[in-house]
Amino acid sequence: LTPKEALTKDDERIVLEAWSLFDQADIIVAHNGKRFDVNKCNGYFLKYGLPKPSPFKVIDTLEIAKKNFNLPFKSLEYLAKFLDVELKLDAGGIETWIGCERGDQEALDTMVEYNRGDIITLREIHKRLKGWDNNGVNIALYNDNHNAVCTHCGSDNVSVLSDKFAYTPNRKYQVYRCNGCGAVLRSNRKEGSGNSLVRVV
């Protein structure tokens, strides 16, 4: 926001910019994005008469953390400390928020840097969690590689786990590990390899 936009509470420009990013995206990564961020943005899109953005998938790091790990807290800040990844910048407390409402340029600049830091933190946390996400987006679908590709991260650097199989009620499948994100995958062909891998659930 510019100082003038902050003072007049005019958020239309940044809502239009956000809509454009959503409309271009294939995948959005967010922490609590499914329950909060996406719906919050949708409300603003509706307010300004914008249509629903074109289809995209959401990878929610909060959902991954809740499903896979018995940690005392699941906030982005806690996960950053727990995983020893770069922590987002301090927003400066309530004074920064008050300054933003008053159109103070320094406060607005601080908030921009804080949010950029948030993105860096989220990116690093997602890198650490994506190998655990068995209900997530199939990244292999966005990859033109004809080799066996990891569904979690899109890497074709996968290795067979010798003598290890995944079983369904009627079949067994060769198991692989992605050397990029650590995900465990299986072939989609009975007792054999294949160029298409699926998640082991």
Question: Over which residues does each language-model region extend?
Answer:
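Short Cys/His-rich "knuckle" micro-motifs
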Residues: 159-165, 188-192
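Short linker/helix segments within small regulatory modules
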Residues: 163-175
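Acidic, Mg2+-coordinating catalytic module of metal-dependent nucleases/exonucleases
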Residues: 29, 78-144
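Short metal-binding segments enriched for Cys and/or His
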Residues: 174-200
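Cys/His-rich microdomains that often coordinate metals
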Residues: 154-158, 182-185
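Short cysteine-rich clusters marking metal-coordination/redox-active sites
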Residues: 148-153, 178-181
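Conserved DEDDh/DEDDy metal-dependent 3′-5′ exonuclease domain
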Residues: 1-82
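Flanking scaffold residues of small Cys/His-coordinated metal-binding clusters
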Residues: 144-147, 172-173
